[in-house]
């Protein structure tokens, strides 16, 4: 399977440097230029999609609908498995305030936010979903609209990077990640949009033999299935 993964449009809360998580927010004034950029880059490369997936948060669903229309797809599939990390009661708090009062913020992937979840838990559910999708749809090319935290989790897991080191890594609203799978294993990673900084020397090829043998770095936490997020909601647009 080939998964093209991008981020949702920019919101007013994103622009205000506040915590968003599972909440939602109106679009920022410059949102359309970012979304147009992503669609244009994919169209220039002649990418065709079999399906479109997103989190079930409004900013991701609306971005997915925009792209789906551009590519002639009438249904999007949304799932909470792709949701941003749940910051619980920290919703709409200033990020600077959170960093001062919670020193674990974007430093400890196992810290559970009050009434929310940890980055590790978010990574586990989202990676479980993507791995299952790749295994069951080996011949498809899919578009996935997700969130910065989810994207960091994907890259850290599939490239074998230390998750804690990348929790503060900036992900542009013009990011386009190109993940190619053999079964559940990601064997190739590229970036087609604004560079994220994760890749410094172009395309990363991960030989299947190396993945199977475990000769590349792997995350410290095992990825578990997430049955509570196993169902998808299909929406006609």
Positions of PLM-derived features:
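Short, hydrophobic/glycine-enriched beta-strand segments
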Residues: 1-8, 144
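Phosphate-handling substructures
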Residues: 13, 21, 25-26, 68-127, ...
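Active-site signature of alpha/beta-hydrolase-fold catalytic machinery across serine-
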Residues: 66, 153-157
